[in-house]
Design a protein with these regions (language model features):
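Basic, flexible linker segments flanking DNA-binding modules
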Residues: 2-55, 151, 207-216
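RNase H-like two-metal-ion nuclease catalytic core shared by retroviral integrases
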Residues: 36-38, 122-124, 130-131, 146-166, ...
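RNase H-like polynucleotidyl transferase catalytic core
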Residues: 27-32, 120-124, 138-157, 173-178
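An active-site-proximal beta-strand-loop segment
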Residues: 49, 53-88, 94-98
Length: 219
């Protein structure tokens, strides 16, 4: 909103005001690491940090992120379109397993069954080396791409989404989610808000879903 209003605030002033008000920045907590060595086929890094696209449904990216709550851990596995920043599909689970990945893919292909030539990017997590995942991509004509090992910048577009998600509805609000059901409902509401209401500079100040619709009408 500062960009929309053409306002700028020096970071030192922000830090000074935060100190005066005894406020602290939100810091990421324990991170989920899915890499377990070479347990399957490792694909080439086709994306190679080139996240630019001409239209929707050209490049997707996926990853898994962990949430720590009082009652246990939770994992979200979304697919994000690099053109629109839209969350194409997601699965929320208490366990990062292949059932989560299968559900995420099924939901994505139900929405968009014709995605031949699309590039799907991920890290080298065991899920993405798994034969089922690779076969599903191949069956739908999708080209698989993987980040280099241990290099989060190769998938920074998804890391940015995870940071935004956690800062806007999780950090500082953990006590608002006393159960998996409550947290799942909150995640669903946030994804709906993010896709259909939350404007972004990248999408010409439109929500991701509206930007996709406008882009596909132009095409």
């Amino acid at each position: 909103f500062r960009r929309m209003l053409f306002r700028s605030v020096n970071h030192k002033r922000v830090q000074r005001v935060m100190n005066q008000l005894e406020l602290f920045g939100k810091r990421p907590k324990e991170k989920y690491h899915s890499y377990k060595g070479d347990v399957g086929k490792v694909a080439d890094n086709i994306i190679n940090r080139n996240f630019s696209t001409e239209k929707p449904l050209q490049k997707w990216t996926t990853d898994v992120s962990q949430f720590n709550l009082s009652w246990g851990k939770c994992y979200i596995s979304p697919i994000l379109d690099m053109n629109t920043n839209e969350i194409i599909s997601y699965n929320l689970s208490t366990s990062p397993n292949m059932e989560q990945i299968k559900d995420m893919l099924n939901k994505a292909f139900e929405r968009f069954p014709s995605v031949q030539g699309l590039v799907m990017h991920s890290d080298q997590g065991w899920q993405y080396q798994h034969a089922f995942y690779r076969n599903e991509l191949q069956k739908h004509g999708i080209i698989q791409s993987m980040s280099r090992k241990g290099n989060c910048y190769d998938n920074c577009i998804m890391e940015t989404f995870f940071g935004r998600l956690k800062n806007e509805m999780f950090y500082g609000f953990e006590k608002d989610y006393p159960s998996f059901e409550a947290f799942s409902k909150a995640i669903a509401e946030y994804i709906d808000y993010y896709n259909n209401s939350r404007i972004q500079a990248k999408t010409k100040w439109m929500p991701p879903s509206k930007f996709r619709e406008a882009s596909m009408m132009e095409g």
